[in-house]
Amino acid sequence: MVLFPPSNALFPALSPAPFSCILFPMQKKIAAINDLSGLGKCSLYADISIASAMGIEVCSLPSAILTSQTGYRDYCCTDFTYQISTYTEKWSNLGLSFQGILSGFLASSDAADEVCEFLERFHSKGTLYLCDPVLGDNGNCFFTLGERQTAAMRKLAARADILTPNLTEFCLLYQASYEELLRQTAGDTEALAEELLSIYRHARSAEAVSATDDRSSTDEAQTVIVTGIPSLNRNTGEKEMVNLILNQAGIIGRSSTKRHGAEVSEQGTSYSGTGDLFAAVVLCDLLCGRKIEDAVRLATAFLSRSVADTVREETDRNGGIHFETHLSMLLPESVPPTRPGDLL
Protein backbone atom coordinates (compact mmCIF):
# COMPACT_ATOMS: atom_id res chain seq x y z
CA MET A 1 0.00 0.00 0.00
CA VAL A 2 1.29 3.47 -0.95
CA LEU A 3 0.24 6.44 1.18
CA PHE A 4 0.12 9.87 -0.47
CA PRO A 5 0.21 13.27 1.25
CA PRO A 6 -3.33 14.38 2.14
CA SER A 7 -5.05 16.75 -0.24
CA ASN A 8 -6.48 19.95 1.23
CA ALA A 9 -9.23 19.75 -1.35
CA LEU A 10 -10.37 16.49 0.15
CA PHE A 11 -9.52 17.34 3.76
CA PRO A 12 -9.92 21.10 4.19
CA ALA A 13 -9.67 20.85 7.99
CA LEU A 14 -6.04 19.78 7.77
CA SER A 15 -3.25 22.31 8.12
CA PRO A 16 -2.26 23.94 4.81
CA ALA A 17 1.45 23.41 5.58
CA PRO A 18 3.17 21.31 2.87
CA PHE A 19 3.52 17.66 3.85
CA SER A 20 7.26 17.72 3.16
CA CYS A 21 7.76 20.57 5.63
CA ILE A 22 6.50 18.60 8.64
CA LEU A 23 9.56 17.52 10.62
CA PHE A 24 9.53 14.88 13.33
CA PRO A 25 12.34 14.07 15.76
CA MET A 26 13.88 10.62 15.49
CA GLN A 27 11.82 8.19 17.56
CA LYS A 28 13.60 6.81 20.60
CA LYS A 29 13.65 3.13 21.35
CA ILE A 30 13.77 1.05 24.53
CA ALA A 31 14.23 -2.64 25.21
CA ALA A 32 11.76 -3.92 27.81
CA ILE A 33 12.76 -7.18 29.52
CA ASN A 34 9.75 -8.28 31.51
CA ASP A 35 7.06 -10.94 31.75
CA LEU A 36 3.89 -11.00 29.69
CA SER A 37 0.88 -11.71 31.92
CA GLY A 38 -2.54 -12.39 30.46
CA LEU A 39 -4.26 -10.79 33.46
CA GLY A 40 -3.17 -8.04 35.83
CA LYS A 41 -2.30 -5.10 33.55
CA CYS A 42 1.35 -5.23 34.55
CA SER A 43 4.85 -5.86 33.21
CA LEU A 44 5.08 -5.74 29.39
CA TYR A 45 1.44 -4.63 29.12
CA ALA A 46 2.33 -1.59 31.21
CA ASP A 47 5.68 -0.99 29.51
CA ILE A 48 4.22 -1.02 26.01
CA SER A 49 1.22 1.13 26.93
CA ILE A 50 3.27 3.82 28.66
CA ALA A 51 6.11 4.04 26.18
CA SER A 52 3.78 4.11 23.19
CA ALA A 53 1.75 6.94 24.71
CA MET A 54 4.97 8.89 25.27
CA GLY A 55 6.12 8.43 21.68
CA ILE A 56 8.79 5.81 22.37
CA GLU A 57 9.14 2.51 20.53
CA VAL A 58 9.23 -0.66 22.64
CA CYS A 59 11.21 -3.76 21.70
CA SER A 60 9.73 -6.45 23.93
CA LEU A 61 11.81 -9.29 25.37
CA PRO A 62 9.56 -11.60 27.41
CA SER A 63 11.31 -13.13 30.42
CA ALA A 64 8.27 -15.34 31.05
CA ILE A 65 4.70 -15.80 29.85
CA LEU A 66 2.00 -16.17 32.49
CA THR A 67 -1.71 -16.81 32.29
CA SER A 68 -2.05 -14.10 34.94
CA GLN A 69 0.22 -12.25 37.31
CA THR A 70 1.25 -14.25 40.37
CA GLY A 71 -1.21 -12.58 42.74
CA TYR A 72 -4.02 -14.72 41.35
CA ARG A 73 -4.60 -18.01 43.16
CA ASP A 74 -4.32 -20.09 39.98
CA TYR A 75 -1.83 -19.34 37.22
CA CYS A 76 0.71 -20.97 34.94
CA CYS A 77 4.18 -19.53 34.26
CA THR A 78 6.29 -20.48 31.25
CA ASP A 79 9.92 -19.55 31.89
CA PHE A 80 11.57 -17.83 28.90
CA THR A 81 15.03 -17.53 30.43
CA TYR A 82 16.48 -19.84 27.77
CA GLN A 83 15.29 -17.45 25.03
CA ILE A 84 16.94 -14.27 26.35
CA SER A 85 20.30 -15.16 24.78
CA THR A 86 18.55 -15.75 21.45
CA TYR A 87 17.07 -12.25 21.53
CA THR A 88 20.48 -10.84 22.44
CA GLU A 89 22.15 -12.62 19.53
CA LYS A 90 19.52 -11.84 16.91
CA TRP A 91 19.10 -8.20 17.90
CA SER A 92 22.87 -7.81 17.94
CA ASN A 93 23.09 -9.32 14.45
CA LEU A 94 20.52 -6.77 13.30
CA GLY A 95 22.64 -3.94 14.68
CA LEU A 96 19.97 -2.66 17.07
CA SER A 97 20.73 0.02 19.62
CA PHE A 98 18.58 1.49 22.36
CA GLN A 99 18.28 4.79 24.17
CA GLY A 100 16.83 2.98 27.19
CA ILE A 101 16.66 -0.49 28.71
CA LEU A 102 14.14 -1.57 31.34
CA SER A 103 14.21 -4.87 33.21
CA GLY A 104 11.55 -6.14 35.59
CA PHE A 105 10.29 -9.59 36.57
CA LEU A 106 12.70 -12.49 35.98
CA ALA A 107 11.49 -16.07 36.28
CA SER A 108 14.79 -17.51 37.52
CA SER A 109 18.16 -16.55 38.96
CA ASP A 110 19.81 -17.66 35.70
CA ALA A 111 17.81 -14.97 33.91
CA ALA A 112 19.85 -12.30 35.69
CA ASP A 113 23.02 -13.69 34.12
CA GLU A 114 21.33 -13.62 30.72
CA VAL A 115 20.26 -10.01 31.26
CA CYS A 116 23.84 -9.15 32.23
CA GLU A 117 24.95 -10.54 28.86
CA PHE A 118 22.27 -8.42 27.20
CA LEU A 119 23.60 -5.36 29.01
CA GLU A 120 27.15 -6.19 27.91
CA ARG A 121 25.97 -5.81 24.34
CA PHE A 122 23.41 -3.03 24.54
CA HIS A 123 24.06 -0.93 27.68
CA SER A 124 26.46 1.44 25.97
CA LYS A 125 27.36 5.03 26.73
CA GLY A 126 24.25 7.15 26.30
CA THR A 127 21.88 4.25 27.04
CA LEU A 128 19.87 4.61 30.25
CA TYR A 129 19.26 1.36 32.14
CA LEU A 130 16.42 1.21 34.65
CA CYS A 131 16.16 -1.87 36.87
CA ASP A 132 12.82 -2.50 38.57
CA PRO A 133 13.88 -5.27 40.99
CA VAL A 134 10.70 -7.34 41.30
CA LEU A 135 11.36 -9.27 44.51
CA GLY A 136 8.64 -8.74 47.08
CA ASP A 137 6.22 -6.51 48.97
CA ASN A 138 4.93 -5.96 52.50
CA GLY A 139 8.21 -7.11 54.03
CA ASN A 140 8.19 -10.49 52.31
CA CYS A 141 9.96 -12.00 49.33
CA PHE A 142 7.50 -13.27 46.71
CA PHE A 143 6.93 -16.97 47.30
CA THR A 144 8.11 -17.88 43.79
CA LEU A 145 11.55 -16.38 44.51
CA GLY A 146 14.31 -17.12 46.98
CA GLU A 147 17.71 -15.95 48.19
CA ARG A 148 19.43 -17.11 45.02
CA GLN A 149 17.09 -14.95 42.96
CA THR A 150 17.66 -12.00 45.30
CA ALA A 151 21.43 -12.38 45.00
CA ALA A 152 21.12 -12.51 41.22
CA MET A 153 18.98 -9.37 41.20
CA ARG A 154 21.68 -7.56 43.20
CA LYS A 155 24.01 -7.95 40.23
CA LEU A 156 21.56 -6.15 37.98
CA ALA A 157 20.83 -3.51 40.61
CA ALA A 158 24.53 -2.69 40.84
CA ARG A 159 24.65 -1.99 37.10
CA ALA A 160 21.52 0.16 36.93
CA ASP A 161 21.53 3.88 36.23
CA ILE A 162 18.06 4.10 37.78
CA LEU A 163 16.79 1.65 40.42
CA THR A 164 13.11 1.61 41.48
CA PRO A 165 12.59 -0.75 44.45
CA ASN A 166 9.71 -0.55 46.85
CA LEU A 167 10.67 -0.50 50.53
CA THR A 168 10.64 -4.30 50.79
CA GLU A 169 12.82 -4.71 47.72
CA PHE A 170 15.24 -2.06 48.97
CA CYS A 171 15.68 -4.06 52.19
CA LEU A 172 16.13 -7.32 50.28
CA LEU A 173 18.72 -5.81 47.95
CA TYR A 174 20.76 -4.17 50.68
CA GLN A 175 20.21 -6.87 53.34
CA ALA A 176 18.40 -4.66 55.83
CA SER A 177 15.63 -5.71 58.22
CA TYR A 178 12.27 -4.41 57.02
CA GLU A 179 10.64 -4.81 60.43
CA GLU A 180 13.54 -3.21 62.30
CA LEU A 181 13.62 -0.30 59.88
CA LEU A 182 9.95 0.45 60.44
CA ARG A 183 10.30 0.01 64.19
CA GLN A 184 13.22 2.41 64.43
CA THR A 185 11.65 5.14 62.32
CA ALA A 186 8.10 4.74 63.73
CA GLY A 187 6.37 6.33 60.74
CA ASP A 188 8.74 9.32 60.61
CA THR A 189 9.46 9.79 56.90
CA GLU A 190 12.44 12.06 57.53
CA ALA A 191 14.04 9.52 59.85
CA LEU A 192 13.28 6.73 57.38
CA ALA A 193 14.87 8.70 54.54
CA GLU A 194 18.07 9.21 56.52
CA GLU A 195 18.19 5.54 57.48
CA LEU A 196 17.68 4.43 53.87
CA LEU A 197 20.45 6.76 52.77
CA SER A 198 22.80 5.35 55.40
CA ILE A 199 22.02 1.77 54.34
CA TYR A 200 22.53 2.63 50.68
CA ARG A 201 25.84 4.41 51.24
CA HIS A 202 27.17 1.52 53.30
CA ALA A 203 26.13 -1.02 50.67
CA ARG A 204 27.61 0.96 47.79
CA SER A 205 30.88 1.42 49.66
CA ALA A 206 31.05 -2.34 50.23
CA GLU A 207 30.34 -2.92 46.54
CA ALA A 208 33.14 -0.55 45.57
CA VAL A 209 35.64 -2.44 47.73
CA SER A 210 34.68 -5.88 46.41
CA ALA A 211 33.77 -4.92 42.84
CA THR A 212 35.44 -6.85 40.06
CA ASP A 213 33.05 -5.70 37.35
CA ASP A 214 34.07 -2.29 36.09
CA ARG A 215 30.74 -2.00 34.31
CA SER A 216 28.86 -1.46 37.57
CA SER A 217 27.21 1.92 37.82
CA THR A 218 29.32 4.52 39.60
CA ASP A 219 28.11 6.02 42.87
CA GLU A 220 27.59 9.37 41.20
CA ALA A 221 25.66 7.93 38.28
CA GLN A 222 23.14 5.72 40.05
CA THR A 223 19.86 7.10 41.32
CA VAL A 224 17.54 5.07 43.55
CA ILE A 225 13.82 5.81 43.82
CA VAL A 226 12.26 4.02 46.78
CA THR A 227 8.58 3.82 45.90
CA GLY A 228 5.25 3.54 47.68
CA ILE A 229 6.30 4.25 51.26
CA PRO A 230 3.20 4.58 53.50
CA SER A 231 3.40 7.78 55.52
CA LEU A 232 1.35 10.23 57.58
CA ASN A 233 1.27 13.92 56.72
CA ARG A 234 2.28 15.80 59.89
CA ASN A 235 0.28 18.89 58.94
CA THR A 236 -2.99 17.35 57.77
CA GLY A 237 -2.90 13.95 59.45
CA GLU A 238 -3.82 12.33 56.12
CA LYS A 239 -2.30 9.07 54.97
CA GLU A 240 0.14 9.50 52.08
CA MET A 241 2.33 7.51 49.76
CA VAL A 242 5.89 8.84 49.50
CA ASN A 243 8.56 8.21 46.88
CA LEU A 244 12.13 9.04 47.94
CA ILE A 245 14.86 9.87 45.42
CA LEU A 246 18.43 9.35 46.60
CA ASN A 247 21.96 8.78 45.44
CA GLN A 248 25.36 8.57 47.09
CA ALA A 249 25.33 12.34 47.67
CA GLY A 250 22.08 12.37 49.63
CA ILE A 251 18.30 12.69 49.38
CA ILE A 252 17.76 14.60 46.15
CA GLY A 253 13.98 14.70 46.01
CA ARG A 254 10.65 13.22 47.01
CA SER A 255 7.05 13.16 45.92
CA SER A 256 3.93 12.33 47.85
CA THR A 257 0.28 11.79 47.14
CA LYS A 258 -2.82 11.20 49.20
CA ARG A 259 -3.72 7.57 49.74
CA HIS A 260 -7.11 6.79 48.20
CA GLY A 261 -8.99 4.61 50.64
CA ALA A 262 -8.31 1.03 49.66
CA GLU A 263 -5.35 2.01 47.46
CA VAL A 264 -2.96 0.57 50.00
CA SER A 265 -3.90 -1.49 53.00
CA GLU A 266 -2.40 -0.96 56.41
CA GLN A 267 0.03 -3.73 55.48
CA GLY A 268 1.14 -1.90 52.35
CA THR A 269 -0.37 -4.23 49.75
CA SER A 270 -0.82 -2.32 46.50
CA TYR A 271 -2.57 -2.83 43.18
CA SER A 272 -1.00 -5.02 40.52
CA GLY A 273 1.20 -3.21 38.02
CA THR A 274 1.70 0.08 39.84
CA GLY A 275 5.45 -0.46 40.15
CA ASP A 276 5.71 -1.37 36.46
CA LEU A 277 3.76 1.71 35.43
CA PHE A 278 5.84 3.96 37.69
CA ALA A 279 9.13 2.63 36.32
CA ALA A 280 8.01 2.95 32.70
CA VAL A 281 6.84 6.55 33.12
CA VAL A 282 10.08 7.55 34.84
CA LEU A 283 12.33 5.99 32.20
CA CYS A 284 10.37 7.36 29.25
CA ASP A 285 10.09 10.83 30.75
CA LEU A 286 13.85 10.91 31.33
CA LEU A 287 14.38 9.92 27.70
CA CYS A 288 12.12 12.83 26.76
CA GLY A 289 14.65 15.14 28.43
CA ARG A 290 13.02 15.87 31.78
CA LYS A 291 14.75 15.90 35.16
CA ILE A 292 14.44 12.97 37.55
CA GLU A 293 12.35 14.96 40.05
CA ASP A 294 9.91 15.98 37.30
CA ALA A 295 9.70 12.41 36.01
CA VAL A 296 8.87 11.10 39.48
CA ARG A 297 6.22 13.79 39.98
CA LEU A 298 4.61 12.93 36.66
CA ALA A 299 4.58 9.21 37.47
CA THR A 300 3.12 9.92 40.91
CA ALA A 301 0.35 12.15 39.54
CA PHE A 302 -0.49 9.65 36.81
CA LEU A 303 -0.78 6.79 39.27
CA SER A 304 -2.74 8.87 41.76
CA ARG A 305 -5.47 9.68 39.24
CA SER A 306 -5.55 6.12 37.93
CA VAL A 307 -5.78 4.59 41.39
CA ALA A 308 -8.54 7.01 42.42
CA ASP A 309 -10.69 5.77 39.52
CA THR A 310 -9.91 2.17 40.39
CA VAL A 311 -10.89 2.61 44.03
CA ARG A 312 -14.21 4.21 43.04
CA GLU A 313 -15.03 1.17 40.92
CA GLU A 314 -13.96 -1.23 43.70
CA THR A 315 -11.76 -3.23 41.34
CA ASP A 316 -9.93 -6.25 42.75
CA ARG A 317 -6.27 -5.38 43.37
CA ASN A 318 -5.10 -8.33 41.25
CA GLY A 319 -6.76 -6.81 38.20
CA GLY A 320 -4.54 -3.72 38.19
CA ILE A 321 -5.54 -0.08 37.91
CA HIS A 322 -7.60 1.83 35.36
CA PHE A 323 -4.74 3.82 33.87
CA GLU A 324 -5.73 3.69 30.20
CA THR A 325 -8.07 6.69 30.35
CA HIS A 326 -5.28 8.83 31.82
CA LEU A 327 -2.61 8.14 29.20
CA SER A 328 -3.24 11.59 27.74
CA MET A 329 -1.34 12.99 30.75
CA LEU A 330 1.80 11.43 29.29
CA LEU A 331 1.60 12.68 25.72
CA PRO A 332 4.74 14.54 24.61
CA GLU A 333 4.36 18.30 24.91
CA SER A 334 5.40 18.67 21.28
CA VAL A 335 2.22 16.93 20.11
CA PRO A 336 -0.56 19.51 19.62
CA PRO A 337 -4.01 18.68 21.00
CA THR A 338 -6.47 17.26 18.49
CA ARG A 339 -9.01 19.76 17.18
CA PRO A 340 -12.60 18.72 16.45
CA GLY A 341 -12.08 19.47 12.75
CA ASP A 342 -9.12 17.10 12.52
CA LEU A 343 -11.33 14.05 12.94
CA LEU A 344 -13.52 13.13 9.98
Predicted regions and their residues:
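Short, positively charged and aromatic/hydrophobic N-terminal segments
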Residues: 10, 18, 22-23
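Short, small-residue alpha-helix embedded
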Residues: 171-172, 268-292
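Charged C-terminal helix
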Residues: 293-344
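Short pre-catalytic strand/loop immediately N-terminal to key active-site residues, enriched for Gly-Thr
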Residues: 38-39, 252-273
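Conserved N-terminal subdomain of the carbohydrate kinase-like
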Residues: 27-143, 324-344
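Conserved phosphate/ATP/ADP-binding segment of small-molecule kinases
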Residues: 144-252, 264-267
